[in-house]
Amino acid sequence: MTLYEEIKARGLVAQITDDEIIDLINNGKATFYIGFDCTADSLTAGHFMALTLMKRLQMAGNKPIALIGGGTTMIGDPSGRTDMRKMLTKEDIAHNAACFKKQMEKFIDFSDGKALMLNNADWLLNLNYVELLRDVGACFSVNNMLRAKCYEQRMEKGLSFLEFNYMIMQSYDFYYMFQHYGCNMQFGGDDQWSNMLGGTELIRRKLGKDAYAMTITLLTDSQGKKMGKTAGNAVWLDPNKTSPFEFYQYWRNVSDSDVMKCIRMLTFLPLEQIDEMSTWKDQRLNEAKEILAFELTKMVHGEEEAAKAQNAARALFSGAAGDAEHMPNTQLTEADLTDGSIGILTLMVKAGLAASNGEARRLVVQGGVLVDGEKVAAPTVSFTAEQLSKGIVIKKGKKVYHKVSL
């Protein structure tokens, strides 16, 4: 099986511009880039598809370029957005880019020029605006740009001229790296297709040469929602933002209908093994979820942390909640208490288990909250400093555990 056949069989390929892509990546002759706009100080589980694809292609001899969007982040990509992104300072962007690099090195080998990490701020921030309009802007049709899917959602609610330039900036990135780094291919999410075509067309019109693009399937659940978030919050690769235990639990708790797709797309397990696992049913699906969670946690946090997270999760599910060393935790202070105690509703909000007292109240009334294995009988229940000093474990629903101590 060729490399392209494998990534196709894993469901990673959405669409390609030309069949030449197949020969290039199969023969290790692709120098390709994927862009990362550094809008936060950590990558998320949503970046997994891109990171694992870069690793697969590098293992086959292709050369990845991880492009940090230090310049484009100052504009903000409107793709898939209904609002304008928050503007970041140069200092914020530089800090976020440094964090990205540290995390990417767990997936990609940057030694001896096997991969490059570039920052488009190095060329975009020095561009002369008039020259850009004349040399690059003349290659773009406003009519075609307005028909692009990446702008479609924003047209009714308002698209700033700043954001309208994003396609030109991303296209210029490809054009620049084609000239200076021999980059002949761009990969990205399926929602980036219009922007990527802009780059291939710019190279063709300015240089008379061919460049290629391939979009990666978006990681969505069985309901079509993007994966990589839990309770509305991103699942981060930074252990200080999402602990290895929380990260493990996110993947351990994927639905039965999503687990095999995630294993196929995200892990490096052989396809033959995955095909055999696809026949598993009922309780064996839980085993598949453990395999998924362990493999991905190992990839991001290392085998030792993955084993700790798995052992902690197994202990919790077996009822041994006292073994809670690696679960999410909240440390209270005396200032959090009122007259030496704290109510369950306030406690749940402080622990991030509910967005408000009202939500916490509903969970308690519905019988969905346990403390140290005992169902919380009423929303008026409170806990003393003495109880909290020993530590308590709150269980929300069937799968969410949180340790609270004073």
Residue spans of the language-model regions?
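Divalent-metal (Mg2+/Mn2+/Ca2+)-assisted nucleotide/phosphate chemistry catalytic cores
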Residues: 10, 89-90, 96-217, 221
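Buried hydrophobic packing segments
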Residues: 50-57, 177, 195-203, 296, ...
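Positively charged, low-complexity intrinsically disordered leader regions
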Residues: 1-32
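Conserved nucleotide- and phosphate/pyrophosphate-binding catalytic cores
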Residues: 203-406
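Short acidic, glycine/serine/threonine-rich loops at helix termini
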Residues: 76-80, 127-133, 225-231
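N-terminal catalytic cores of NTP/NDP-binding nucleotidyl/phosphoryl-transfer enzymes
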Residues: 21-78, 186-193
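Divalent metal-coordination and catalytic microenvironments
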Residues: 7, 44, 117
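A charged helix-plus-loop insertion that forms the helical arch/lid used to bind
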Residues: 78-94
